[in-house]
Structure formats: structure tokens, C-alpha cells
From Swiss-Prot:
It is found in: Cell surface; Cytoplasm; Cytoplasm, Cytoskeleton, Spindle. This is Hyaluronan mediated motility receptor. Glycans are attached at residues 134, 279, 446, 467, 488, 509, 530, 561, 601. The modification Phosphoserine is found at residue 20.
Amino acid sequence: MSFPKAPLKRFNDPSGCAPSPGAYDVKTSEATKGPVSFQKSQRFKNQRESQQNLNIDKDTTLLASAKKAKKSVSKKDSQKNDKDVKRLEKEIRALLQERGTQDKRIQDMESELEKTEAKLNAAVREKTSLSASNASLEKRLTELTRANELLKAKFSEDGHQKNMRALSLELMKLRNKRETKMRSMMVKQEGMELKLQATQKDLTESKGKIVQLEGKLVSIEKEKIDEKCETEKLLEYIQEISCASDQVEKCKVDIAQLEEDLKEKDREILSLKQSLEENITFSKQIEDLTVKCQLLETERDNLVSKDRERAETLSAEMQILTERLALERQEYEKLQQKELQSQSLLQQEKELSARLQQQLCSFQEEMTSEKNVFKEELKLALAELDAVQQKEEQSERLVKQLEEETKSTAEQLTRLDNLLREKEVELEKHIAAHAQAILIAQEKYNDTAQSLRDVTAQLESVQEKYNDTAQSLRDVTAQLESEQEKYNDTAQSLRDVTAQLESEQEKYNDTAQSLRDVTAQLESVQEKYNDTAQSLRDVTAQLESYKSSTLKEIEDLKLENLTLQEKVAMAEKSVEDVQQQILTAESTNQEYARMVQDLQNRSTLKEEEIKEITSSFLEKITDLKNQLRQQDEDFRKQLEEKGKRTAEKENVMTELTMEINKWRLLYEELYEKTKPFQQQLDAFEAEKQALLNEHGATQEQLNKIRDSYAQLLGHQNLKQKIKHVVKLKDENSQLKSEVSKLRSQLVKRKQNELRLQGELDKALGIRHFDPSKAFCHASKENFTPLKEGNPNCC
């Protein structure tokens, strides 16, 4: 190699702080370790300082080259990261839209649940009203049963038999009395006929004596008038007796008919008893059904309360999860800020490395001319190295914090995954239990509906029986009306008999007229007539006694007739009461039938509503199950991806920790090498400052120091200069190669850090804020205002 010879002026001109390269000698020693060695002097006691200085130069040059290479790689990585960030933002927006749709569905489900709850409350109110009406109807049934028992007590079989026996005995007595009286009357009539025959004979004999008896006719006529009155009274009594006998016969017929009616009424009462027993059984069945319905309602209320509690717990857990996500997002934002700070620190380090590289270049260009400047720059570099060391320590701390946070986030993700799985299992169990409860309730409801149908059929049969009894009562009333008509006919016949008696009275008057004609003939037989009058007086006495006895008997018969009429009136009243009770029972049965029809209609409507609600709930449950399965699959995929990413991150972190430890060791070695040199430079700087502050003598001292420095560092000849320059170039090339290696390593490290940061962002769902998209987030806009009962927001 040949090097051009520099002019002597350059080496001898004392320009600046340091002498020219040719103005000093270079002496090699065996104890030196670096490529450049210096002779010991009073200020420079250690030989390691030059070597440490050169090592620092190598590091600065390597860092500058590594930063240049890293800039080109970081641009590509930033482009890739921007693409990944955009893709992640799109995915996050899609997920937010899906979440908004799910929230809307949940709100719709809540509104439908509120509607169903309102319907159920209305059904419960209707049921309470029906239960109240049922209670009132049961009270009516109890009152009817009491009235029926009273009627049974009144019309018991023993009482009827006793009354019938008493009436039959009285009728037998009356019959015997009537027969004895008829016999006595027949005997008297025969005696009268015999007497009349005798009188006719006497009349034929006394025709001649009529003239004699005309004078006595006045008295006889008076007596005859009295006798006529008495005979009229007797005829009236006889007619009354005949009427009484006719009435007795009619009463017998009426009694027989009443006995038949009583038997029929007993049968009807038995049928009514059976129907009442059936009604009691039906009421018991209805009570059992109401109890079952109440149990079903309580079960349904319990299920609804459990569903509400579970929904509240789920909503609370969702709120807790959202709060946790918000906290994690805040932590992630803090981590992002820390990363931004670390990136800013790295950029500052890059700038510092660039400055150091520029300073190294200037130092290499002005190596020989500005050694003092080089020392000052070395001081600055050492200070910056301290700052860099501190920043590296901070970056290590940040990396450790990031590792801990990634571990904590991974643990939280595993916990969330476990919680989600447990909640899914609980939801599936809850859905299965809810479906089973719905099926059980449906079966119970079908059973109750079937029992209601049976009850309605039984009530219809009871209604038919009531209709039959009402028809029989109508027939009885018709019979009673026919009997009333017969009674009216008998009264009419009695009026006809009285008319006949009046005609007979007229005939009797005619006979009296004939008797007046015969009075003339009767005068002749006055004596005989006196005898006959005596006999007639006896007969009249007998007739009076008979009249008194017959009057007593007639009074007794009248009393018996009154008692019978009272009994008939009582029976008619009881029949009317029974008819009224039957009418009330018919009205109650009609009301029951109407209520049963209303219940059937309502039950059919409620069955349809329950079927619709169950079908809609089953569809919604299936949709929710499908959505949960899809979400589970998505979460599992995301967790698998996160696990892979965490594994990759752990590998990268292990590599980074290895590299950090390596660089730490290198830095410690450099720091140990630069410590003594730093102390000497500090002492030199202090001396320089003290000398610069002095006037006059300071310049001379500086010149002396410059000369001594030139003597120490000056070359004795050209060969030594060439060797020194060759050594410097070799050291420079070595430093450049080391700087390139360090830059490549730093680029790799930054790439790994960026990749890890992107994976962390993907795992935590955090994206960097784009200022161009400020106030334009469609997913975060509340298009619909929040309701009062919807505290959850997207």
C-alpha cells in the first residue's frame, strides 16, 4: 500500500485543541490490549482507556448502521401491521354489529316476556273472579241442600205413612157412620111409607069426614106450614148429607191421586237427592281441579321467578364481564401508552444512535485534528450511554410488565373461558329444566282440560235430569189443574142438584095445593089425623134428635173437610215451594252451564295462547342454543388462536430475554472498561476548565499541554504513521462490522417486539386510534335511545 505524503504545514500547524498526527511519537508496549497504545504520563496512568474508547466507537458505528437497516424493515412491518390492524378493526366492527343485533333480540325477548307476564296476570285475575263466582255458587248449593233437607224432613216417608194411616182410619170411621145413618134413614123411610099407606087408607075412609074437618084446617094448615118448614129443613139436611157424601167420595179420589202424586214426588226427591250428590261430587272434583290449577300456577310462578332470578344473575354477570372487559381495555390502553412511550424512547435512542453515528463519522474524519473534541464527545457519549442503559433497564422492566400482564390476561382469558363454559352448561340445564317444566305443565293442563270436559258432560247429564224433573213437575201441575177443573165441575153439578131440588120444591108446592084440596076430605078423619099428628109429633121429635145428631156429624165433617182443605193447601204450598226451588235450581244450572261454557272457551283460548307461547319460546330457545353453540365455537377458535399466539409470544419472549441478557453482559463489560477512562477524562475536563478560566498563564499552560500531548501521541517517522493508520482502519472496519451486526440484531428485536405487540392487540381486541376516524365510529353511535329498563348498552 502507498499513502501520499501530507504537507508539513498540516502536521506542524497547531490549529484547534489537538496537534497534528506527525507531531507526536507512538510507542508500542507489550502490556497494551487495544490496537492503539499510549505512553504513560502523569495524567494518563491506565493503558486500557484508549482501547475502551475505541470499543465505544465501534458500538456507536454499529448502532448507526443497524438503525439504518431497521428503518427499512420497520416500514415493511408497519405496512403489514397497518393491514392487520385494519382487518382487526373490520372484525371488531362486525362483532360489535352482531352484539348490537343480539342486544336488540334480547330487548325484543324482554318485551315479549313482559307481554306474556301481562297475559298471565290477566288470566290469574280471571281465575280469581271465577273462583269467587264458584264460591258464591257453592254457597247457593249449600243453601239448596239445606232447603232440600228441610223438604225431606217435611215430606219424610214416615210422616206420609202416618198421615195416610190416620186419614184412612178417619175415612173408615166416616164410612161406617155414613152406612149406619143411611140404614137408619132407610128404616125411617120405610116406616114413613107404611105410615103414608095407612094415612091413604085413612083418607079414603075419612072422605066423608072432610067437611067436619074444614073448620080445623086453619090450625092444621099452620101446623102444616110448620111441618113444611121442618120438612124443608130435613130435605136441606138430606141434600147436605148427600153433598157431603159426594165430597167424601171426591176427597177419597183426591187422596188417592195425592198419594200417587206423593209417590211420584218421593221418586223425584230421590232423583233430586242423587243429582245433588252428583253435584256435590262435581263440586268436590271442581275443588280438586281448582287446587291443581292453583298448584300449577304456583309452580309456574316459581318457574317464572327462578327464570327472572337467573336472568338477573346472568345480566349481572354480563355487566361484571363488561366491566372487566372495560378494565382490560383500560389496562390495554395503558399498555399501549407504555408501548408508545417505549417506542418514543426507542426513537429517541435511534436519534441518539444516529447522532452518535454522525459524531463517529465526524470523529473519524477529524480524528487527528480534534482529540479534545473527541474527549468531550466521549463524555457526552458516556452520559448518553448511561441514559441508554437506564432506558434499556426501563424497557426491560416494561417487557417484564408486559410479560406479567400477558400472563395475567391469559389467566383471565382462561377464567373467562371456564366461566363461559360453566354458564353454557347452566343455561343448557336451565333450558332443559324449563322445557321439561313446560311439558309437565302442558300435560297437567291437558289433564285438567279433560277433567273439565268430563265435568261439563256430567253437568249436561244433570241438566237433562233437571229438565226431566221440571217436566214431571209441569205434568203434576197440569194434573192439579185438571183436578181443579173436576172440582169446578162437581160444584156445577151441585148447583144443578140445587136447581132440581128447587123444581122438586115447586112440585111439593103443587102437592100442597092438592093437599089443600084434600083438606076437605081430611076433616072427616080429624080424629084419625090427631092420632096421626101425635105419631107425627113423635116422628118430629125423632127427626129433631136425628137432626141434632146429623148437625153434629155435619159439623164434624165440615171440620174434617177444613182440615183436609188446609192439608191440601199445605201440600199445594209445598208443591209451589218445590217448583220455585226447581226453577231456582234450573236457573242455577243454566248459570253453571253458561259458566262452564265460558270456562271451556277461556280454557281453549288459553290453551291456544300457551301453545303459541311455548312454540315461540321453543323456537327462541333453539335459536339461542344455535347462537350459543356458534359463539362457543368462535370462542374456542379464538382461545386456540390465543393459546398459539401466547406460546409463540412465550418463545419470542424467551429469545428476547436471552438477547437482553447477552446485551446486558456486553454492556456491563463495556461499562467496566470505560470506568477508569471516564475518571481520567473527568479529571482532564476539570483541569481544562480551570485552565480556560485563567488569564494569561492559562494559554501558556494550554500550549504546554498541547506540546506534551503532541509529544505523547506524535509519530516519530512515516512507518509508524502508516502502521498507526492501518491499525485505525482495521479497527474502524471491525467496528463497522460489529455495528452492522448490532443493527441487524436490533432490527430483529424490534420486529419481534412489533409482532408480539400486534398479537397482543389481536388477543386483547385493542386497536390503535386513527385520528382521521374520530367521531365516525358507527358501532358506538346510539341510533335508538336507551329505555328506562335497559341499562346495558353496546
